[in-house]
Design a protein with these regions (language model features):
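Flexible, small-/acidic-enriched active-site or ligand-binding loops
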Residues: 206, 256-287
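A short, Trp-centered hydrophobic/proline-enriched beta-strand micro-motif
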Residues: 186-195
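A short core secondary-structure module
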Residues: 217, 221-262
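N-terminal glycine-rich flavin-associated loop
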Residues: 154-174, 203
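Alpha-helical interface subdomain recognition
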Residues: 1-147, 158, 170-175, 182, ...
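Short Gly/Pro-enriched turn/cap motifs at secondary-structure boundaries
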Residues: 198-202, 226-229, 241-242, 268-275
Length: 450
């Protein structure tokens, strides 16, 4: 009895009698109290929420996500946890600083230790400290990195895919033991030197960088251009044509090799955080023990490119998804004519077209990675995904910029970066034209290469 009296007293202290008197002149208080008493807990909670908001319940909007078909729910709990771990890192560590570094064309080296803690480098490789996860997980990681910034995803792709991949697929056991553990921990940085100033798509038959055997060493001469990570790499995978048999071979070039020179490339409009370099090799001496022992022709080089081309398709998805999600978020906050622009028909049409492309791309690359995990991936599979995803990404980022109006070209709204970086994705790891010829050869039975 005493406790009930105490509760009644506490309730009485909080009653505003003047307000209650004014209210009783407008409504039948006993009737209201009876109606409120019949409400269940959920109904009462809803009523209180409405009262606290001044009688106007705030509209709860759907979450901002580009995963409209919930593809991530097909992942195992372990893989889903890793995906969210990478996403958190990118949103908390990269998003706040990315525009400044992009504008200054510098790389944020301070993030490398935290990136290493994610333990995702060399994600599909077995041994040497590598995680030995699926190709699907590798694709998911590439997408999550590119969803915030394509440059960081490209840096990672060069290190984990092209550089480490060349050693993992084509190196001797001694070479793997020497390089892969340190590269996996991001203590040793790698680069991949294939493209040349006058040779891009025609690398299979047109490399001008030469390698001349001289006893137990090789002499390398030539130039490489657009080489990501080149300005700070500890080891560079250099592809050169053997002057004796005319076959392409791979070499592990150490950064302190005499005759090696690298200059940072400036004035890029895309992937500005990536440190691309122009490499000059002048009588660089490389030991036979530093030649990739299983890289005997360009067919072996193509094995590396096939593996990484699938990752670039995922990267395109991430770029498109990031642009779409920023655009969607913007349109729900930006008001014109008294309401969010997301409420207008034409804006919704653009958003749906963007989402359609992002969803189609995601389902395509998901199947692509399944083929890779099943050992069924062919050149034409990866090439088709690269063609389709890079094209659709261009369309998505264009519409994302469009719905933002003039603000779409400001870095602070993020989409401008994606617009620029989509152009780089469109070109590297095989142009649309080269990849189209690869797919065309597969479906027609005729090669149109000249």
């Amino acid at each position: 009895m005493f406790s009930k009296i105490k509760e009644a007293y506490q309730l009485w202290k909080h009653i505003d009698l003047d307000a209650l008197g004014r209210l009783s002149q407008k409504i039948d208080l006993p009737q209201v109290m009876e109606a409120v008493g019949r409400l269940d807990d959920q109904q009462l909670a809803g009523l209180m929420k409405m009262l606290r908001s001044g009688g106007h319940a705030k509209k709860e909007l759907p979450p901002v996500t580009g995963d409209f078909y919930d593809i991530s729910h097909k992942l195992s709990e372990e893989d889903r946890a890793l995906q969210l771990k990478v996403r958190t890192f990118m949103e908390q560590e990269i998003q706040p600083i990315v525009n400044e570094y992009w504008l200054n064309a510098e790389f944020p080296f301070e993030i490398i230790p935290k990136l290493a803690e994610l333990n995702i480098c060399g994600v599909t490789y077995e041994g040497y400290g590598c995680p030995n996860r699926s190709f699907l997980m590798e694709g998911i990681i590439a997408m999550e990195l590119a969803r915030v910034d394509t440059s960081i995803s490209t840096f990672f792709g060069v290190q984990s895919g092209l550089a480490m991949g060349s050693i993992y697929l084509l190196g001797s056991e001694e070479q793997k033991q020497e390089w892969l553990p340190g590269m996996q921990q991001l203590k040793i940085m790698g680069a991949f030197g294939l493209t040349e100033p006058e040779v891009g798509s025609g690398a299979a038959g047109g490399l001008t960088t030469t390698a001349k055997r001289d006893g137990d060493k090789w002499i390398l001469n030539g130039q490489k251009k657009w080489i990501g990570n080149a300005t700070f790499a500890d080891v560079l995978v250099i592809w050169a044509r053997d002057v004796d048999d005319n076959e392409v071979k791979g070499f592990l070039l150490r950064k302190d090799t005499p005759g090696f020179e690298v200059k940072k490339m400036h004035d890029k409009m895309a992937l500005r955080i990536v440190q691309n370099g122009l490499i000059t090799l002048t009588d660089c001496v490389v030991a036979e023990s530093d030649r990739l022992q299983h890289a005997r022709s360009f067919k072996d080089t193509a094995e590396v490119l096939r593996m990484t081309r699938a990752g670039v398709a995922w990267q395109a998805v991430g770029c498109a998804r990031g642009a779409y999600e920023h655009a969607l978020d913007y349109t729900r906050k930006r008001k014109q004519f008294g309401k969010p622009i997301a409420a207008f028909q034409l804006v919704q049409n653009h958003l749906v077209e963007m989402l359609s492309n992002v969803t189609a791309m995601q389902t395509m690359v998901y199947r692509l990675s399944e083929l890779q995990d099943q050992g069924m991936l062919k050149d034409e599979h990866a090439s088709l995904a690269k063609v389709f995803c890079s094209l659709r990404t261009r369309d998505v980022v264009s519409k994302a910029r469009e719905v933002m109006g003039g603000n779409g070209i400001l870095l602070e709204h993020n989409v401008a970066r994606f617009v620029a970086d989509a152009e780089a994705i469109y070109s590297y790891e095989g142009t649309k034209e080269i990849n189209s010829l690869i797919v065309g050869r597969a479906i027609t039975g005729f090669s149109a290469f000249v």
